[in-house]
Curated annotation (Swiss-Prot):
The lineage of its organism: Eukaryota, Sar, Stramenopiles, Oomycota, Peronosporales. It comes from the Eukaryota. Transmembrane segments: none annotated. It comes from Phytophthora sojae (strain P6497) (Soybean stem and root rot agent). Interacts with host plant ER-luminal binding immunoglobulin proteins (BiPs) such as soybean BiP1, BiP2, BiP3 and BiP4. This is RxLR effector protein Avh262. Keywords: Host endoplasmic reticulum, Secreted, Signal, Virulence. The gene is Avh262.
Length: 123
């Protein structure tokens, strides 16, 4: 019981010796944040300039349409119940090629996450 009393006395002396907490540890004044700083360090999406090469994206879409049409002509259904591993691998390889050609065109979090799982990954 004696050590607890000693600790309480020391704490009481320390608190009463300082007139206020702000003298012991002054807090910095906060400045008002600008509109862009409140949202984070990123700029507004509408203010961003993106260079999108529509040729590579349209080429990929046209290649996929050709594959679908070839499957339809061969007698396969347009929407198979499940995709085979070979189908997933072939589409993933094409996507990897396109993403490696123009990585800034594709949205990084979504496409790279799927590509890493599908065909060896993209850095």
């Amino acid at each position: 019981m004696l050590p607890v009393a000693v600790v309480l006395v020391v704490f009481a002396v320390a608190v009463t010796s300082a007139e206020s907490i702000h003298q012991v540890n002054p807090l910095p004044r906060r400045r008002r944040l600008k509109g862009t700083e409140e949202k984070g360090h990123h700029t507004n999406v509408n203010d961003e300039e993106r260079v999108i090469s529509l040729e590579s994206a349209s080429d990929l879409i046209s290649k996929l349409k050709v594959k679908i049409n070839a499957k339809l002509l061969a007698g396969d259904s347009a929407k198979p119940a499940t995709l085979s591993k070979a189908q997933v691998a072939s589409v993933a390889k094409e996507v990897v090629k396109e993403v490696k050609k123009t990585p800034k065109v594709w949205p990084p979090p979504m496409i790279k996450k799927g590509v890493r799982r599908g065909a060896g990954g993209v850095r």
